[in-house]
C-alpha cells in the first residue's frame, strides 16, 4: 500500500472504478488524546470536531458527507447493504456492501482489522470491521455471502491493524479460532508475556478465512497500529483515543 496525503491506498488490481482508502490520524482538528483526524463519534471527542473531520474526509475523496455509510459497530457479524435510502442512518452492523456508485462503505478501527472487498468487474464492494470476536464469528463469511458474486472473483485488501508482535490474547481466543478451523493454530505462538497467553496474527487469521472462502487475492497487512503512533490511533496502546476510517466505494 502507498501513502498519499493523510491516507493509505491499496496496491491492488481492482477495477479503475473501485476506490479505497484508510485514513491516518493526521490532518484533522481534534485535540489530545484524539489528535487529530478522529472520525469516531463514540469516543467522547467534541462532536463538532468529529463533524469537521468527517467533512474534511468527504471533501478529500470527493463524496458528499451523507454518502458515507457509517456503522454502529458492536463486534458482531451483521452485514448491511448500503443504498440511497439508508446510507445516512448509522445502521447497527460490522460490515456493509453496496452496488451503488458514489456511496462509500466505511468501518472505524483503532487496532481491529479493516477488510475491504471488491469484485473483478467493479459491480460490488464491501468492508468489514474485524475485531477477533467478529472475525471468529464469521463477519467475513457473511459479507462474502451477502455480496452474492462468486468468491473467486473477489479480491481483498487488509488495512492497518494491530501487528502480531503486539496482539496478546488469552487461551480462549486461540481455542475459539482453532475450534472453527484447526489451521488457525499457525496464526498463534506462545510468546505471550503473561503465562498461558499467546501472540496472534490477525492478518493471517483473516487471510485464512478469505482463502477458505475462495478469495485467493489478498493484499495489504504488515502494519502495526500499536507500534506506529505517528500514523495510527491504537486503543490497546492509549486507551482513550480516536478512530481511523477505511472506506471503499464505486465511481460512476
Where are these regions (language model features)?
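Active-site microenvironment for binding and transforming phosphate-containing groups
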Residues: 1-252
